[in-house]
Amino acid sequence: MNRNSVMLPLLSMVLLASCHSPKEKMVSMAKQNLEASLDYPKQLKITANTKPDSAYGVNYFTRKEITGMLKVMDVVTKQLMTKTNGVNDISKADPYTVNLMRRQMSAATDVQTMIFKNVPKGEWSGWKVKIDYECADKDGLKYRAERWVFFDREGKNVVKTFEIPLP
């Protein structure tokens, strides 16, 4: 009897310590998805991440989220305009600026599509996690970005990712 009274609490503590909540697993999966997409995953430095939040379609963002994205993109665009003389002098741009411009144009296309489509809030479709990170690209140049990872309703599968550069 004495042995069981010690083993049962010990076993329950081990089980509790080994269990992670589904939301913690989604954050971990989002980080793994990010690592798998990078040229140099060992150089990844995650600077922030959100807890999983409800998603209502992979193209629906709240007004606050869109405003945040547009503010970030505005800062990046102003940096690019300054470095390239209003995009009139791209030939002298350094590799970092060229890479930033490429990533900004890709993100701008996605954001414009979201805004102009004005996707209404649909039914609950799953979860989303945002990760801010720093890493190096295929040329070894350091960069910063914000990555959105969308999961299915069960939080087990990544269904879409979306990324914008950070200044």
Q: What spans do the regions from the language model cover?
A:
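Sec-dependent bacterial lipoprotein signal peptides
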Residues: M1-A17
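Cystatin/cathelin-like cysteine-protease inhibitor module
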Residues: C19-P167
